[in-house]
Each structure stands twice: as structure tokens, then as C-alpha cells.
Amino acid sequence: MPRSFLVKKHFSASKKPNYSELESQTVYISPFIYDKFPVIPQPEILSTGAYYTPLVWDTGLLTTFFTSESDYKKSPISPSSSDDSSKPLDLTSFSSEDEGGKTSDPPSPASSATEAEKFQCNLCSKSYSTFAGLSKHKQLHCDSQTRKSFSCKYCEKEYVSLGALKMHIRSHTLPCVCKICGKAFSRPWLLQGHIRTHTGEKPFSCTHCNRAFADRSNLRAHLQTHSDVKKYQCKSCSRTFSRMSLLHKHEETGCTVAH
């Protein structure tokens, strides 16, 4: 390790370097540093024919596909085998060695159907062309029959997920209890709406009238009274109502048919 890394040197921040001590302040750049990097020539622009070479059939190369000259002369592409030189070549008679001398015929409809239905469900025997289609089928249909269910210990209801079962159990245990009257609820927001009945707070007001409500659902039901569409109709007097509860109240109080 150099000594400069082991010895501490204390420099004064107020002391500035004296550049006049240098023999010369001129900077020299050697012209030989660029000799090591040769200049890359510009690419030569070729004509269109250089990029798109025409396809030329050389019949002299076809002799390499035959074992002897006699086989080449007997072939249909030999010039001596046919007098008509303008007759097109029949390339379907040749095949590669890997295919064993068989021509590549188009697939039959039976083989196409087998290829399209190669993924089969082992539960309902339905077939699919892709593995993704088979997986989606199992997830939506077949898995629902074999899927593990979670049963409630308070009633006979069953749920697919454990989270849904826990939310249902709250309707039996009622963990949210009002400290004023002792009434219990299954959800915190139900308890919060109940506490407003004790405090008298009604933060949800109607924009059409001066009525206010402690719960948003009550305000939503009240807004239907201002709607022009009243789809609940009394069968006796043909009077229409915006809510089913208002129709039931009308029928319980006694419907008076005007004669």
C-alpha cells in the first residue's frame, strides 16, 4: 500500500494553490492519441436489386438428390424425360428423407377434431382445445362440486370461503353493543347509525325538502318520494306509491275506493 494512504496530511482550507509555480500553464494535446482509433467508413448504398435477388432454379444442382445419373434421367424434371420444356415441374413427387417418402397431405377433419379437443376434463369428460380453457372450466363448474365448504356452527348454512363464514357468524354473535341501551349489532356502521338515534344527530338531509335522517339508507328511501316514477300501485284504488312500504301502510290503514 502506498505511503500516501497511511500518512494523514492536514491541508489548510484558507491556503490556495499557487499556479505560478508551474513552469508553463499551456496545455498540450498529443495528436497521436487518435491514431489508435481507425475511422469507420460510411456504409455503401447498394441498388434495390442487391437486396432482392431473384430466385433462379439451377437444374444442375438437382443431380445431388439422386444416387446415380440414370435415376436423374428417369425423373420427371430431367430435360430428356419430356419433350415439352414448358410443362411445369411436379414438386409434389419429391419428399424429404425424414418423412420416409410420404407426401405432406393436409390434415383430415378427424385429426383436426382430435387436435382441437386434446384437453379433457376428468370429472365431466368435456374437452377443450387449450389448457387455459380447461382450467377455467374446472374453476367455474367442476371445482364447485368438489370444493371444500365451511359450515356454520350456529345454523346449517355453508360458505365457500372462510372469510364469508366469519362475516356470517357476526350475525349470530352480534359483537357491536350499544353502551347506552345495550342493543347489539353485527356491523360497526349499524351501531353507529343506532347511536345517532340517542344523540339526535341527523347528518343526512334532503335537498328537496327540509327533512333530515340519521342513516343514509333512510335518506335514499325518502328521495324516492320526490321521484316522478311511482311503480307500486294499489289494486283497489289504483293509487301509486314510490315505495313498497308506503303501499303496505296504505293497504293496512284501509283503502277507500271513491265511488
Swiss-Prot record:
Localization per record: Nucleus
Modifications made to the protein after synthesis: Ubiquitinated.
The entry's keywords: Developmental protein, DNA-binding, Metal-binding, Nucleus, Repeat, Ubl conjugation, Zinc, Zinc-finger
GO term, biological process aspect, one: neural crest cell fate specification
Predominant place of localization: nucleus
Region spans: Disordered: 71-113
SMART domains in the cross-refs: ZnF_C2H2 (SM00355)
Organs and tissues of expression: Maternal expression is nearly completely restricted to the vegetal hemisphere. Zygotic expression begins in the dorsal marginal zone just before gastrulation (stage 9), and is almost completely absent in the animal hemisphere. At mid-gastrula (stage 11-11.5), expression begins in the ectoderm in an arc surrounding the prospective neural plate. From stage 12, anterior expression is down-regulated, while levels are increased in the prospective neural crest.
One GO molecular-function entry: zinc ion binding
UniProt cross-references to PROSITE patterns, sorted A to Z: ZINC_FINGER_C2H2_1, ZINC_FINGER_C2H2_2
KW Ribonucleoprotein (keyword) present: no
Region (SNAG domain): 1-20
Highest taxon, organism lineage: Eukaryota
GO cellular component: nucleus
Description of what induces expression: By two classes of mesoderm inducing factors: transforming growth factor-beta (TGF-beta) family and fibroblast growth factor (FGF).
Zinc finger (C2H2-type): 119-141, 150-172, 176-198, 204-226, 232-255
Oligomer status and interactors: Interacts (via SNAG domain) with limd1 (via LIM domains), wtip (via LIM domains) and ajuba (via LIM domains). Interacts with elp3; the interaction inhibits snai1 ubiquitination and promotes snai1 stability.
Role noted for this protein: Transcriptional repressor. Acts upstream of snai2/slug, zic5 and other neural crest markers in the specification of the neural crest and neural crest migration. Involved in embryonic mesoderm formation.
PANTHER family per the UniProt record, alphabetical: ZINC FINGER PROTEIN (PTHR24388), ZINC FINGER PROTEIN SNAI1 (PTHR24388:SF37)
Family: Belongs to the snail C2H2-type zinc-finger protein family.
Protein name: Protein snail homolog Sna
Source organism of the structure: Xenopus laevis (African clawed frog)
